[in-house]
Curated annotation (Swiss-Prot):
HAMAP family: IPP_trans. Its EC number is 2.5.1.75. This is tRNA dimethylallyltransferase. It catalyses: adenosine(37) in tRNA + dimethylallyl diphosphate = N(6)-dimethylallyladenosine(37) in tRNA + diphosphate. It comes from Arthrobacter sp. (strain FB24). SUPFAM superfamilies: P-loop containing nucleoside triphosphate hydrolases. Monomer. Its cofactor is Mg(2+). One of its GO terms (molecular function) is ATP binding. It is an enzyme of class 2 (transferase). InterPro entries: Dimethylallyltransferase, IPT, P-loop_NTPase. Disulfide bonds: none annotated.
Length: 312
């Protein structure tokens, strides 16, 4: 993904375009399948909003939708990064909004699908990402080393008391001061608001948590049986462990430990299951906080029809 250093993406759309659709929910809940079903009914195209599915070669461990599962529906923003590249939510915002505009320009419906909550909000909501300045950052980090966190926090309190009260660690205090020096605006002024940048509708998949726990365990075991360790080994040769984002992906970080001789396959599998379940709980907490989402039972036989009713 390539974009200007500082941007908030395209912020206007032609009048009369249909609402963007976003299918959200925890991992393993069936978002990809529902997005494809909606696309087939609405003449739509799907935009990936799962940060780990940006990576080429990370297929098994991310449950990336296969060509067969796409059922002829065009998919965008899959396989856009090498594992050594860092995923950027601001870059995604730019790419996603440009892709939405292109899809609408073809007279099609744009359908986001993914469980990376901040990425979904970046595409849908009024959300700005201030740029960075390595020189300012370096100077502030040197001041942190010389004068200490308390000194930088007092400076932040003078220009942005909201951030000073909210941010606890040194890295974030440095970032808040960097943003103020770079933009003249308080870092807190860039915080997201629940306001769509263009019309949108979000479809959430309501899950039975116990059933989801079982499904996630089965899915991880299936990934291992289908060659997850070999996939991690191939990607390690391509620099996986040096990628700040990709190396932290569920399953991949665990099986790197297998390659290093720290864990056996069983340990890596069980840790991946536990970590995936925790991740699903965090996703549910994130999406549940958004009152705009229309929730539907993931196992409802009329799921597609009910989702279509709020999308048309």
């Amino acid at each position: 993904m390539a974009s200007p250093q500082e941007h908030s993406g395209p912020t206007t759309q032609p009048r009369g375009v249909p609402p963007v659709i976003a299918v959200v929910g925890p991992t393993g809940s069936g978002k990809s399948d529902l997005a494809v079903a909606l696309a087939l009914e609405l003449d739509g195209e799907v935009i990936n909003a799962d940060a780990m599915q940006f990576y080429r070669g990370m297929d098994i461990g991310t449950a990336k939708i296969t060509a067969e599962e796409r059922r002829g529906v065009p998919h965008h923003l899959l396989d856009t990064l090498d594992v050594t590249e860092e995923a950027s939510v601001s870059d995604f915002q730019w790419e996603a909004r440009a892709t939405i505009a292109e899809i609408h320009g073809r007279g099609k419906r744009a359908i986001l699908a993914g469980g990376s909550g901040l990425y979904v909000r970046a595409a849908l909501d009024v959300l700005e990402f201030p740029g960075t300045d390595p020189g300012i950052r370096r100077r502030l980090e040197e001041e942190l080393d010389d004068a200490g966190l308390a000194t930088l926090r007092r400076r932040l309190e003078a220009v942005d008391p909201v951030s000073a009260a909210r941010l606890g660690d040194a890295r974030r205090v440095v970032r808040a001061l960097e943003v103020f020096e770079l933009t003249g605006r308080a870092f807190s002024s860039f915080m997201p608001v629940r306001e769509y940048y263009q019309p949108a509708v979000q479809i959430g998949l309501e899950v039975d948590r116990e059933l989801l726990k079982d499904r996630l365990a089965q899915r991880v075991h299936g990934m291992v049986a289908n060659g997850l360790q070999a996939e991690v080994q191939r990607l390690d040769a391509a620099g996986l462990r040096h990628g700040k984002t990709a190396s932290r992906a569920l399953g991949y970080s665990q099986f790197l430990k297998v390659l290093d001789g720290e864990w056996d396959t069983g340990q890596a599998t069980e840790d991946t299951i536990v970590a995936t379940r925790k991740f699903a709980r965090r996703q549910l907490t994130w999406f549940r906080a958004d009152p705009r989402i229309h929730w539907f039972d993931w196992q409802d036989p009329d799921l597609v029809a009910k989702a279509l009713a709020v999308c048309r």
